[in-house]
Amino acid sequence: MSTPVVVVSTVTHGERSPGVAILSDVSLSAMAGEVVVIEGRSGSGKSTLCQLVAGLEAPDRGTVTVGGSPAASVRDWARLALLPQRLGLPAELTVAENVTLPCWVRGMPARPDLLEAFDLAHLADRRTGEASRGEQQRMAIARAAVLGPDVIVLDEPTSHQDEAHADLVAHQLLELARAGSAVLVATHDPRLVAEADQVVHLHAGRHHHP
């Protein structure tokens, strides 16, 4: 029997207000090749859960593991990659340089196919600071995907996309899953909700089972 690549076990974390946690007793798991959508209203804890799975924080209680290791100890972009809401792309680099940065760090060939896949090839030599918010969001997704990570965590990946590019992003995330990545997405996007293997509903920081 296959082992989940992501396991969130009875996690309680943060403080929404005095004595009230941002996340309370949340559990989920994801297999390689699965798309897991994390859904909920603003303030329900989606972004906090993404940060925990991406290893940016360790949970106050409970455990979060990626490939059997605590998520907070994983520092390998090929194992665990993140698209945060705040993209943090170096503005002085070109679009192509930003997308391929993880390849350079590892001494690997560039991935011009990803520029094509995310409709960025025509912008390859443009400075990132000159790109639109939607273009920068697609750049950040492509950069997160460039090493084919075991797990990719994305916080609202279509929030700055028009309809056509939202379709494109959803398609590429499904392709990542087909290639074997576990794809965890915090989103309201009906395209991804419809295609998800699992939908985790958060309500006031708790996993709500409709």
Predicted regions and their residues:
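Q-loop/switch helix immediately C-terminal to the Walker
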Residues: 86, 93-105
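Conserved ABC ATPase "signature" region
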Residues: 108-123
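Helix-to-loop junction immediately C-terminal to a conserved catalytic motif
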Residues: 54
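ABC ATPase NBD coupling module
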Residues: 69-81, 105
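Conserved catalytic motifs of ABC-family nucleotide-binding domains
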Residues: 148
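Conserved ABC ATPase signature
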Residues: 127-131, 135
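Catalytic Walker B motif of ABC-type/P-loop ATPase nucleotide-binding domains
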Residues: 152-156
